[in-house]
């Protein structure tokens, strides 16, 4: 595939374009084949670019957008009332073929609504789902939905499982193990929609469905793809990130109590740094909206520079793998087998 072109919503997120522009320039330096389009208030973006010195402008373009979507803005207002928002213009670049992917740290609800409107969903998919990598004991698993769909039918959960399995395959996992997140592993556990989804998955051909999984099983690495509704997934994701930050803070406090603990900490520092890097939320930042006729990656609104770089890197990988087309081909077969 030709060099990836990624459209960046430069005005999204809690910090506006400051971190986003810095992360974008760092990615350009790290990936010589990458091309970026920064979308937003052009004068402000150009000012931020100028502060960072020499930049290869042959691989960087700035597209002006006169409006920005607030983090607390209603999706309906973003959809109908702001046709020239940075988020919408970035998505339209993907729809028109001028970019292969869009990355935004903006309002999640607005991004979902605009993505569905501008890019449309793949055949057979009712609603896109948000998926991201969750660190586990043995590596990581792909988990969806992470907040795009608070209430989900059994059919939606089935579609999420199919999409998650296909994504895991594109990332090199052979016969990915697919599980439904539940309050227990027994057949009688779970709400009605989870039980109905389990029946659909058990009957599906071409899916390696292994049954229910509990939260602790997720972290033990017992599945490659874990499926749940967006309410449960978002709570689990935020709790995981908070737990990782708390553990890092407690370790730091423990090793700085006195001279002896600082000496022990100095000896353990290389291992602790490695653990901190492996579990850092910034490393795993970037959730994909699966099920669209285009690539969209959602970054945390509060992402650091390195965190937003991770989101851009995820978009690069999916662009190089031509993920929407790969999804489309596999979805046609799996959805037909599962719902005929």
UniProtKB/Swiss-Prot annotation:
Catalytic activity of the protein: a fatty acyl-[ACP] + phosphate = an acyl phosphate + holo-[ACP]
A cellular-component GO term for this protein: cytoplasm
Domain of life where this protein originates: Bacteria
GO molecular function: phosphate:acyl-[acyl carrier protein] acyltransferase activity
EC number(s) per entry: 2.3.1.274
One matching Pfam family: FA_synthesis
Class in the EC hierarchy, top level: transferase
Keywords in alphabetical order: Cytoplasm, Lipid biosynthesis, Lipid metabolism, Phospholipid biosynthesis, Phospholipid metabolism, Transferase
Main location as per UniProt: cytoplasm
Gene3D superfamilies, per the entry: Isopropylmalate Dehydrogenase
GO biological process, one term: phospholipid biosynthetic process
Subunit comment: Homodimer. Probably interacts with PlsY.
Protein family (similarity comment): Belongs to the PlsX family.
PANTHER family: FATTY ACID/PHOSPHOLIPID SYNTHESIS PROTEIN PLSX, PHOSPHATE ACYLTRANSFERASE
HAMAP family, per database record: PlsX (MF_00019)
Function description: Catalyzes the reversible formation of acyl-phosphate (acyl-PO(4)) from acyl-[acyl-carrier-protein] (acyl-ACP). This enzyme utilizes acyl-ACP as fatty acyl donor, but not acyl-CoA.
Protein name listed in UniProt: Phosphate acyltransferase
């Amino acid at each position: 595939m030709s060099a990836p072109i990624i459209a960046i919503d430069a005005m999204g997120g809690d910090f506006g374009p400051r971190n986003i522009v810095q992360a974008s320039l760092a990615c350009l330096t790290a990936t010589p084949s990458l091309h970026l389009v920064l979308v937003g208030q052009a004068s402000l973006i150009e000012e931020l670019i100028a502060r960072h010195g020499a930049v290869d402008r042959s691989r960087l373009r700035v597209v002006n957008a006169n409006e920005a979507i607030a983090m607390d803005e209603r999706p309906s207002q973003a959809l109908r009332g702001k046709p020239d928002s940075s988020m919408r213009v970035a998505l339209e670049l993907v729809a028109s073929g001028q970019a292969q992917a869009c990355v935004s740290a903006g309002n999640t609800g607005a991004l979902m609504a605009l993505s569905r409107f501008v890019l449309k969903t793949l055949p057979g998919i009712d609603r896109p789902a948000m998926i991201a990598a969750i660190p586990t004991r043995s590596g990581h698993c792909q988990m969806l939905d992470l907040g795009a769909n608070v209430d989900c039918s059994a059919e939606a959960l089935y579609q999420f499982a199919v999409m998650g399995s296909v994504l895991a395959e594109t990332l090199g996992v052979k016969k990915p193990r697919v599980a439904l997140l539940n309050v227990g592993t027994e057949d009688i556990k779970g709400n009605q929609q989870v039980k109905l989804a389990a029946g659909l998955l058990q009957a599906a051909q071409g899916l390696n469905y292994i049954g229910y999984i509990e939260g602790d099983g997720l972290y033990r690495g017992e599945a490659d793809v874990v499926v749940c509704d967006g309410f449960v997934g978002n709570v689990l994701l935020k709790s995981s990130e908070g737990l990782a930050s708390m553990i890092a803070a407690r370790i730091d406090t423990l090793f700085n109590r006195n001279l002896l603990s600082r000496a022990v900490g100095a000896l353990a520092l290389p291992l602790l740094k490695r653990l901190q890097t492996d579990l850092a939320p910034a490393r795993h930042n970037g959730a994909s909206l699966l099920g669209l006729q285009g690539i969209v990656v959602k970054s945390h609104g509060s992402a650091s520079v390195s965190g937003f770089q991770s989101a851009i890197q995820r978009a690069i990988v999916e662009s190089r793998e031509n993920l929407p087309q790969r999804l489309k081909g596999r979805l046609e077969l799996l959805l037909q087998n599962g719902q005929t």
